[in-house]
Swiss-Prot record:
Residues 199-202 are annotated as: Aspartate. ATP binds at R221, D222, E223, E500, G552, V553, D554, R555. It catalyses: tRNA(Asx) + L-aspartate + ATP = L-aspartyl-tRNA(Asx) + AMP + diphosphate. It is an enzyme of class 6 (ligase). This is Aspartate--tRNA(Asp/Asn) ligase. Aspartyl-tRNA synthetase with relaxed tRNA specificity since it is able to aspartylate not only its cognate tRNA(Asp) but also tRNA(Asn). Reaction proceeds in two steps: L-aspartate is first activated by ATP to form Asp-AMP and then transferred to the acceptor end of tRNA(Asp/Asn). Its EC number is 6.1.1.23. GO terms for cellular component: cytoplasm. Gene3D superfamilies: Bira Bifunctional Protein, Domain 2, GAD-like domain, Nucleic acid-binding proteins. The keyword Cytoplasm applies. The lineage of its organism: Bacteria, Pseudomonadati, Pseudomonadota, Alphaproteobacteria, Hyphomonadales. It comes from Hyphomonas neptunium (strain ATCC 15444).
Amino acid sequence: MHAYRTHTCGELRKSHVGETVKISGWLHRRRDHGGVMFIDLRDHYGLTQIVFNPGSPGFATVERLRAESVITVEGKVVARDAELVNANLGTGEIEVVGGAVSVQSEAAELPMPVFGDHSYPEEIRLKHRYLDLRREQLHKNMVLRSQVIASLRRRMVAEGFTEYQTPILTASSPEGARDFLVPSRLHPGEFYALPQAPQQFKQLLMVSGFDRYFQIAPCFRDEDARADRSPGEFYQLDIEMSFVTQEDVFNSIEPVMRGVFEEFADWEGKGRKVAEGPFVHIPYAEAMLKYGVDKPDLRNPILCSDVSDIMMRDDVTLAVFKKIVGGGGIVRAIPAPNSGDQPRSFFDKMDAWAKKEMQAPGLGYMRFVEENGALTATGPIAKFFEPAALAALAEKAGVKAGDALFFSAGDKTAAVRLQGQARIRVGEELGIIEPGVFRFCWIVDFPMYEWDEDNKKVDFSHNPFSMPQGGMEALLAADTVEKQLDLKAFQYDIVCNGVELSSGAIRNHRPEVMLKAFELAGYGPEVVEAKFGGMLNAFRYGAPPHGGIAPGVDRIVMLLAETDSLRDVILFPMNQQARDLLMGAPSPVDERQLKELNIRLAPVVKPQP
C-alpha cells in the first residue's frame, strides 16, 4: 500500500464500500458525538468523513490534534445510513471507519480558522495566505483560474494562433502608468524596466513576419490598487494579428471569449448563460450619452438622454438648469422605470447618495403620472415645466406614466460622471439588473486625442500607437484643437457586464503617420525616436497593417467567479498599499547589494502634515 494514500479525499464512492484505504490530508473539522469521534479530512480534491470509535488505534491521536494538522488515516469504507447521506458532498454516501493514524505535521494554534465562512481582516488573510487559500471558495477560485487559462490557450490555438514569449527585462517607456525599474549591475546608472505590457514586442513580431500571436503575459505597473486592478502585476491574454481590419480582430476574438464564458457559465451550478447573437457594437460617443460610461453594463435596461435643449425652452422656468446650460454645461436625464410609486425615501436616498458619494449638488427628480388622460408630473422641480415641455421631456427620455426621471446637471465631465453612476445605482436599487447572464459589447470609435487640462494641451486619449481613422489625410486636416479632438482612432474596448476586459487597436504602422500623430500631441520626432526608436526603425523596413487586443485574465476570472475583488482570484496578491505581507516585500536590501548596483539611497523626505 502507498505510504500516504490509495485514494484522495474527494474520490471515495459507494463502489468502494468494503475496501481498506489510506487517505491523507488536513484535519478540517472534528466532532465528538457521545464518545465517537468524527473528523472531516480535506485535501485538494475534497472532503471525506472519518469515524473513530473509542477503541480505535487512532482515536487518542485525533482527539488531541489541532485543526489543520496533516495526517494519514488507514481505514475501511462503509456506506452511510440513508438518512445520513450528504448530497452536497461528493463522498457523501460513504464514510471511513478509521484505524491507524500517522501524523505528518502538527498544526500550531491558527491565526485564522480554515473551516467556516467567517470574515477576517485582509491583513491577516494576506499575511497567512497559505491558510486563506485552504478555504473552500478561494481554493475553488484558483482552480477556476487555472482552468480558464487552459481554456483560453486551447481556444486560441484552435483559432490558428501561436504562443510566443516576449522579454521581461526591457526599456522604460511612457505607456501610461509608472514603470517598475530594475538597476543594471553591468551598466551603472542605467535601468531596465519590467514591461507594462508586451506592446512593442508583439508589434515587432508582426514586423518580423509572424502572424496570429498570443501569450498569457505578465504585466507590471506601479500604480495604486483598485477593486478591479491589482497593484504590481497582472496577467493578460495578449494578442496581435497581421493584415487585419478592426472587424477581423472582433471576428477572431468573439468565439474565444464566448466559448470561455459558455464553458464556465454553469461553474458551481450557477446556471448562467451568455447572451445570444454577435457582441453589440457601440460608438464611444453613444455609450457616454446613453450610459454615462464607456464600459456599460447592458444587463441594466436604463437608457439616458441629453435634455439640455428642453431646459432652454420658454415653457421651462427652472433657472438653475438654464444657467448651467447657458454656461456651456449639460443636463442628462436618467429614467427610473416603474418607480413612480416608490416612497419619498427612495428619492431622498438617491439625492443623499449623489451629495455624499459623488460630491454633487444633488439629484433632481420628477415622477410622471396620468391625470384625466393627460401626462403630468409631480416632484420638487415638476412645477417649473409646462405640460408641453413635460410631454417633450417624456418623449425624449422615453418615460411614461408610472416612471420617474432623475437629472444630472453641471459641466460635461461632472454631469456625465454622475449620470453614469446614477444609472448604475438606480438599476441596483430597483432590482432591474438582469440576473444570470453575461452581456458583451464592443466600444468603438474612441477619440484619438483628449484635452489635458493640467498642461493645457492636446494629448493621446488612450494608446498612442493606434491608427487614426482617415490616416494621414485626417491628421493633416486637423489644423485646430477642435478638429484634433474630433479625430477618431481605430481603437476598441471589449466590455462584459460593466467590466472592461481589454482595450485594443489597429496599430499605426506607417512611420510618417506615427510621427505626425505624435506631433499633434506635442511630441517632437526626437522624443519619439528616443522612446520608441526600436519600433519606429523596424517600421521603416516594411511593416504589415496589424492590430490586436489583450483581455485581462484576472478580470475574466473575477467575472466568472462572481467576486468583487481581484485579490480573490490571484494566488498571492499585494495589499492596497502594494505590499506583499506574506513575503515581506518590498523590503530593504543590504549595503553590499546596493554597492554592486552603484546605488546610494537618499534620505526619505516625509510630506508635511
